[in-house]
């Protein structure tokens, strides 16, 4: 597939501290990406560099095959909805959407109107009088209606209840199916979006831990549970990312694809093999990294 973002050894330093360290990855056209990790991991810094809002200290970055900085041809194809998107206080919702329509060449007026109705936004209310959830809804409408070939959402649903978040996911997937584009989601509500993700990038302490297709990742992340001796024997030499024990029982979380022989052996030893959620996987990965136990990711 066509690569629309290419990042090579990207680094961003603030004095002696590096927010992003030697990160390399590519983003392909027509996929939904999850940019995942703990708060302060470097995700937002990466998104700001991808959208030409922050210069890297070193490394190379291309978006749609070009340097994105001061490049209107590239920037007109990007839509970045920030975690706490700010708007002029004097603007009404209607004014903000008019500006967005003038910025994005692919703006879908009908979709914007439908989303306004879905999220029950008052068109003539001034931005400074909107609740936190309403402000998030405005950002969601801009992101979806922009139809930008690369659309990036950074925690886009602050203040939204579960019903409104579910509506966002539903509308996103519906529009993505009808009008494919590349979408990048950065979120801490990983379990809510995990089934939507096609590719996963995991950032921790400024470094890239995982760059993998979501389906492949799901297929090799699981917990082995059973008597301590049997679990220790079965998991010896395997890629362990988390373990805990209670009494004579032990659970070990692995990130490694098993062959049919492994699965038969586990069953013969009376061990349970439990798939883990994407959120559990990210928690275990970043905990093991912060504890100095860096797993290898095959």
Give the predicted meaning of each segment.
Residues 59-74:
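Conserved ABC transporter NBD signature motif
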Residues 37-42:
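Walker A (P-loop) phosphate-binding loop of ABC-type ATPase nucleotide-binding domains
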Residues 80-138:
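ABC-family P-loop ATPase nucleotide-binding domains
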Residues 169-256:
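ABC transporter nucleotide-binding domain
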Residues 248-298:
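C-terminal coupling/interaction segments
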Residues 151-155, 160:
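Catalytic Walker B motif of ABC-type/P-loop ATPase nucleotide-binding domains
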């Amino acid at each position: 597939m066509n690569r629309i973002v290419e990042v090579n050894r990207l680094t961003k330093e603030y004095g002696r501290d590096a927010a992003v360290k030697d990160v390399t990855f590519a983003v392909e056209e027509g996929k939904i990406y999850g940019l995942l990790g703990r708060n302060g991991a470097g995700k937002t810094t990466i998104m700001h560099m991808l959208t030409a809002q922050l210069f890297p200290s070193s490394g190379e970055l291309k978006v749609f095959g070009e340097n994105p900085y001061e490049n209107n041809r590239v920037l007109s194809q990007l839509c970045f909805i920030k975690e706490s998107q700010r708007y002029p206080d004097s603007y009404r919702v209607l004014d903000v959407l008019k500006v967005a329509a003038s910025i994005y060449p692919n703006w879908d007026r009908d979709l914007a109107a439908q989303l306004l109705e879905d999220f029950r936004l008052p068109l003539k209310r001034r931005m400074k009088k909107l609740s936190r959830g309403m402000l998030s809804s405005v950002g969601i409408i801009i992101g979806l209606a922009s139809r930008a070939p690369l659309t990036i959402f950074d925690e886009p649903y602050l203040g939204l209840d579960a019903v409104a978040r579910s509506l966002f996911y539903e509308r996103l997937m519906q529009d993505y199916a009808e009008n494919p584009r590349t979408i990048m989601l950065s979120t801490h509500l990983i379990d809510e979006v995990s089934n939507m993700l096609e590719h996963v990038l995991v950032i921790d302490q400024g470094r890239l831990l995982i760059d993998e297709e979501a389906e492949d990742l799901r297929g090799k992340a699981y917990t082995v549970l059973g008597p301590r001796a049997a679990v220790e024997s079965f998991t010896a030499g395997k890629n362990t990312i988390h373990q805990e024990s209670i009494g004579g029982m032990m659970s070990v979380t692995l990130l490694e694809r098993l062959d049919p022989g492994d699965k038969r052996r586990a069953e013969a030893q009376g061990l349970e093999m439990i798939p883990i959620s994407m959120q559990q996987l990210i928690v275990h990965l970043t905990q093991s990294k912060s504890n100095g136990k860096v797993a290898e990711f095959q």
